[in-house]
């Protein structure tokens, strides 16, 4: 976690100066870890492969100088996608009304996992409207409904509105729903790829060191055999660098 936070501090000023915003920095893997940089455009436009490539080059240059990760690693730059993670407080306000899943570091109202509709923010806390409970057939689960968010805003007793301090949020992500797809298509003209999709650039930021390969030994020249004819002289190297077989060379 310390390495991730340090990397974020190193690259964020340059990324923002280029017209982008950091969404998430994540490090995964073992001996050769993958450093994932997730970013979006500050102007709200859709990310392109060229955007990801520009960020990748800038980040690579910074990390080569600062060297926050020992050894070899793979750098991956991607766009958030539609079913994006919610990592900043403003994300919960921006996507108010859409369905999301959320997990907390400690129990809130006796639970750690929530699924409901984002209802904005309150100071430094996230407001989440849980589904309106409706009678269902025996054995069937009640599906979330967008009415929960509307009811939560209106203070309807049927909706359960939970307020979660942002500092307790472990991870959160939008649910891929028809409403979200429609909104994304209307905003950008066409639905972009989901998280980890086409808007992604990978490169070996620090290639692994290749094992040393010993140089091939040059074959030694052989002298004339015991029974070579007089005047045969020395063997001459062949065109391929190896010794040419003379008429009096002794077979081995």
From Swiss-Prot:
Subcellular location: Cytoplasm
InterPro entries given in the database record: Ribosome_maturation_RimP, RimP_C, RimP_C_sf, RimP_N, RimP_N_sf
Claim: Cytoplasm is one of the keywords in the record: yes
Keywords: Cytoplasm, Ribosome biogenesis
Residue spans of biased composition, Basic residues class: 208-224
Chief location category: cytoplasm
Recorded superkingdom: Bacteria
UniProt GO BP: ribosomal small subunit assembly; translation
A Gene Ontology cellular-component term: cytosol
Positions of region (Disordered): 188-252
Pfam hit, one: DUF150_C
Family: Belongs to the RimP family.
PANTHER family, sorted: RIBOSOME MATURATION FACTOR RIMP (PTHR33867:SF1)
Function field: Required for maturation of 30S ribosomal subunits.
Protein name as catalogued: Ribosome maturation factor RimP
Organism whose genome encodes this protein: Rhodospirillum centenum (strain ATCC 51521 / SW)
């Amino acid at each position: 976690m310390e390495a991730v936070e340090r990397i974020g501090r190193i690259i964020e000023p340059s990324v923002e100066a280029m017209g982008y915003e950091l969404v998430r920095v994540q490090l995964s893997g073992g001996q050769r870890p993958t450093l994932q940089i997730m970013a979006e455009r500050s102007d709200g436009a859709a990310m392109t492969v060229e955007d990801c490539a520009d960020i990748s080059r800038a980040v690579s240059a910074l990390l080569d100088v600062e060297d926050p990760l020992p050894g070899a690693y793979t750098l991956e730059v991607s766009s958030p996608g539609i079913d994006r993670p919610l990592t900043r407080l403003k994300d919960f306000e921006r996507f108010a009304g859409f369905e999301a899943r959320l997990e907390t570091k400690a129990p809130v109202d006796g639970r750690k996992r929530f699924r409901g509709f984002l209802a904005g923010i309150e100071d430094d806390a996230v407001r989440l409207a849980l589904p309106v409970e409706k009678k269902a057939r025996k054995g069937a689960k009640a599906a979330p409904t967008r009415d929960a968010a509307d009811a939560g805003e209106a203070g309807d007793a049927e909706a359960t509105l939970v307020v979660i301090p942002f500092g307790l949020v472990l991870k959160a992500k939008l649910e891929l729903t028809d409403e979200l797809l429609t909104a994304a298509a209307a905003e950008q003209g066409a639905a972009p790829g989901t998280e980890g999709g086409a808007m992604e650039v990978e490169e070996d930021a620090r290639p692994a060191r290749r094992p040393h390969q010993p140089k091939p030994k040059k074959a030694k020249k052989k002298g004339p055999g015991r029974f070579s004819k007089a005047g045969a002289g020395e063997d001459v190297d062949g065109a391929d660098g190896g010794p040419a077989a003379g008429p009096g060379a002794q077979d081995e």
